[in-house]
UniProtKB/Swiss-Prot annotation:
UniProt name for this protein: Ribosomal RNA small subunit methyltransferase G
EC numbers for this chain: 2.1.1.-
Localisation: Cytoplasm
Organism: Prochlorococcus marinus (strain MIT 9312)
Presence of keyword Transferase: yes
MF term (GO), any: rRNA (guanine-N7-)-methyltransferase activity
InterPro entries: rRNA_ssu_MeTfrase_G, SAM-dependent_MTases_sf
Keyword presence, rRNA processing: yes
Alphabetically ordered keywords of this record: Cytoplasm, Methyltransferase, rRNA processing, S-adenosyl-L-methionine, Transferase
GO annotations of cellular component type: cytosol
Length: 237
């Protein structure tokens, strides 16, 4: 396997065995990219910082929170980040990867067949607006997240209905302003959710600023949410 310039910040987070798995994942994604346009972030720092590091650091940086042995949901998983990154670093957790694109979920199924994941991994081709109203899925996850949607209010409407009462939503944000904080606070009030904790870092090698916002249910989310397909994105709460 070709030697790569892997950022030291990643080596501080994960084991050598996990690095090997991430290298295998990189190779397989690159192969699948020839048939299915999964991602352009597959080489060098684009992969190791923008994909791997960005996916795993939230689960390594809150020492007071146990992220192991959980039921984990990745909404709009695309090429598998952050879900597969979390799977590699938390092998005792059960993973659900959801995407509305059948091409992408078919590619994800190939990935998990060819890489020796220790987790029980489920791939589902559907919209979260549909799945959230299925009794077998709603209020059943310890952790739910997505990097596919940027608006925190929209993300919250997708995530909170999926969480158990003690569950945790992980929101990936770039900039984080007072106005965004105010808007999210209003949304959480509607969805019966609350803030838990926030953290901000500068990604290595000048890859930008990242804010992580942790939210959780105050009570179970009202049954009417999420709204019908398209509404949470077009008309955030």
């Amino acid at each position: 396997m070709k030697k790569q310039n892997i950022p030291k910040e990643i080596s501080e987070f994960i084991t050598k065995e996990e690095i090997v798995m991430f290298q295998e994942l990189q190779i397989k994604i690159a192969e699948l990219n020839n048939k299915t346009n999964l991602t352009r972030l597959i080489k060098g720092d684009d992969y190791w910082i923008s994909q791997v590091f960005d996916s795993i650091w939230p689960f390594k940086t809150f020492p007071n929170i146990n992220f192991d042995n959980k039921k984990f949901l990745d909404i709009g998983s695309g090429c598998g980040f952050p879900g597969l990154a979390y799977a590699i670093t938390h092998p005792n957790s059960e993973i659900y990867l959801i995407d509305s694109s059948k091409k992408k979920t078919d590619a994800l199924k190939l990935l998990i067949k060819e890489i020796n994941f220790k987790n029980n991994i489920h791939i589902i081709n559907d919209r979260i607006e549909n799945l959230a109203h299925q009794s077998s899925m709603r209020n059943s996850f310890n952790i739910a997240t997505t990097r596919a949607v940027s608006n925190p209010s929209t993300v919250s409407e997708y995530i909170l209905p999926m969480l158990k009462k003690e569950g945790l939503g992980v929101l990936y944000c770039g900039k984080w302003t007072d106005e965004e904080n105010k808007n999210l606070d209003k949304t959480l009030e509607i969805l019966e959710g609350k803030f838990k904790e926030t953290k901000k870092i500068l990604l290595p090698r000048s890859k930008g600023t990242r804010n992580i916002i942790l939210i959780q249910p105050k009570n179970l989310c009202p049954e009417i949410y999420p709204r019908k397909i398209g509404k949470p994105e077009k008309h955030p709460l």
